[in-house]
């Protein structure tokens, strides 16, 4: 049985804190930050604004103290403005410095995870339960593309890659579906869970961030990692979202089966729309992945949360825990990792906001990819 641990990285802070690491923050003493945060409660507008502007310029290194103030300050104005600043600092941090990735700020909040008792379709592994996401985070607005993956990992394993198509001597029935198309902006697929973990670490290293994972006893098949001992660390690096974070971000405040409302005929997402769903008429079926950013985003500015490729999450797959939960991370051990969102080759009922799938972490398919999260 595979086991992965979750540990808290013991980061040592010098007199001049630099939580952001690299060029993402300015060095400012904690006492100065504390004084500026107190100024957020000033009765004078100019003093509040000056403090807010200085804090925002410092960048990620203010987030730890801002989060404490937003939760614990006895001054309502300090709590209010600290929460606003957290959003602004995260928004400024929501751009990859080495790729063209853009990230949306997913503000902390509460939601009902799973499928409501009276909603169709509902499966036994989707029991509704209250969940609280206690810390705002960043999530990629799009799935990782073939171009981005190749830039970081120096290889493109995708089946739906135009470069693999059109070989008359050795036809590729998968790649030939996208012959003549520009596929660099299609989502990367044929990715194991371990490959996604390795990508997150490499991207963190490329940008001077602290990697979110350790990987030991690695087993490879060609360019892909099929097994490894993985430990999760609490750092500022890139990572996979948890299953709860993924659904919270996908729903964007909705309680309907899809973040765009009730079922449609395949016109709102890249999925198998040629099978009727509930009262929906049969619709179109593309039959392969499509460019990220196709269709409409949800209210949080996230594209393709339904369909296209199913997305790896951090968690081991298993039954939900009972009762309210804060920042759940899934079972402590297991044999399968969670994929979310459904894909181009499955019907709508498998692409709902609450749809979940357990897949062996070493498995690679042309309908599975991932998107990246980060917690500065």
What are these language model-derived features?
Residues 29, 44, 55-63, 75:
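Alpha-helix initiation and capping sites
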Residues 112, 116-118, 182, 187, ...:
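Functional-site microenvironments in short loops/helix caps that host divalent-cation chemistry
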């Amino acid at each position: 049985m595979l086991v992965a641990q979750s540990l808290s990285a013991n980061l040592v802070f010098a007199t001049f804190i630099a939580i952001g690491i690299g060029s993402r923050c300015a060095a400012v003493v904690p006492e100065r930050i504390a004084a500026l945060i107190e100024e957020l409660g000033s009765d004078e507008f100019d003093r509040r604004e000056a403090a807010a502007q200085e804090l925002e310029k410092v960048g990620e290194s203010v987030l730890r103290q801002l989060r404490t103030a937003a939760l614990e300050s006895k001054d309502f104005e300090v709590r209010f403005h600290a929460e606003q600043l957290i959003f602004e600092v995260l928004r400024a941090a929501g751009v990859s410095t080495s790729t063209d990735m853009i990230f949306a700020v997913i503000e902390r909040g509460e939601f009902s995870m799973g499928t409501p008792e009276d909603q169709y379709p509902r499966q036994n592994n989707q029991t509704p339960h209250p969940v609280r996401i206690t810390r705002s985070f960043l999530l990629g607005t799009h799935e990782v593309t073939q171009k981005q993956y190749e830039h970081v990992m120096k290889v493109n394993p995708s089946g739906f890659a135009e470069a693999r198509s059109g070989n008359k001597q050795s036809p590729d029935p998968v790649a030939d579906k996208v012959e003549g198309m520009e596929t660099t902006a299609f989502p990367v697929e044929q990715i194991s869970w371990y490959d996604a973990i390795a990508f997150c670490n490499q991207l963190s290293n490329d940008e001077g961030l602290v990697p979110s994972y350790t990987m030991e006893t690695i087993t490879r098949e060609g360019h892909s990692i099929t097994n490894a001992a993985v430990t999760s660390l609490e750092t500022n690096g890139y990572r996979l979202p948890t299953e709860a974070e993924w659904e919270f971000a996908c729903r964007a405040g909705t309680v309907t089966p899809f973040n765009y409302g009730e079922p449609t005929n395949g016109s709102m997402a890249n999925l198998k729309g040629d099978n009727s769903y509930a009262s929906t008429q049969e619709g179109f079926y593309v039959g392969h992945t499509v460019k990220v950013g196709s269709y409409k985003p949800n209210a949080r500015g996230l594209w393709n949360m339904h369909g296209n490729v199913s997305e790896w999450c951090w968690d081991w797959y298993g039954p939900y825990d009972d009762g309210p939960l804060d920042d759940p991370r899934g079972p402590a051990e297991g044999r399968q990792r969670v994929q979310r969102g459904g894909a181009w080759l499955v019907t709508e009922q498998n692409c709902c906001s609450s749809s979940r799938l357990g897949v062996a972490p070493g498995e690679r398919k042309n309908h599975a990819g991932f998107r990246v999260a980060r917690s500065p």
